[in-house]
């Protein structure tokens, strides 16, 4: 690794500021500064998330061209589409200016600045248009994007005939358990799309505590059936997170078993996202039939009762309700 490496500019490197400090005041979502110093190069590299995930420099034409080629590669392999992770954080403001500071009390340092220069840059729109052109050359392909720190109106700007087919919006998933609250979230998201566009909805994902915990109890599947009725009949495309169809619950983990970087950093104030990422519960076999060896995260203790095989054979089960 050196400054002369042809791939050096594929990432965002900067020399230290006068006095040796970091290039700007940006913070990592996972905690701490967004800059990591490399002793060998004498430079900082940018990582909006974990330090093992350096941000690509999308302003480098070679990076952009290569990423577009990656889309073509997988489309040629026959994939049906893509989910773009925090895509609106791909581009950063060219001058990497300091973000303005937020007022008031904020627990996390990340929340103490207003994130305007490292997300939702205008260059993202042409990039999405190029991605969409590639997908449109293949029949029946689909691309959805996960926005980062963007409200529903901002997320909607990335959707269109020449952009994403859909973008995720957390307003629906974050609603309290009431018809009025869900109705308000649905009506607002639907109104942003209009009659000629198509909304989408999710209740669960890898960053959100399972709806079975948020809205129901350890064994209350009646509310989950009600949620499924709403979720699968509202105008729009529903997304399901694995295990949602059998009512999987979060697992409780001691600190020693946590894998999630922010969970390790903020324990016990934030006990990680690992609780809603446990292995799929297929059957009552060891490790719930997910694997023949110990998985990355432990299986929920209820797997011998709550699994696909058991519910498939129970007419009134949540799984058969989904079917």
For the regions a protein language model found, what residue spans apply to each?
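Active-site and adjacent substrate-binding regions of carbohydrate-active enzymes
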Residues: 1-323
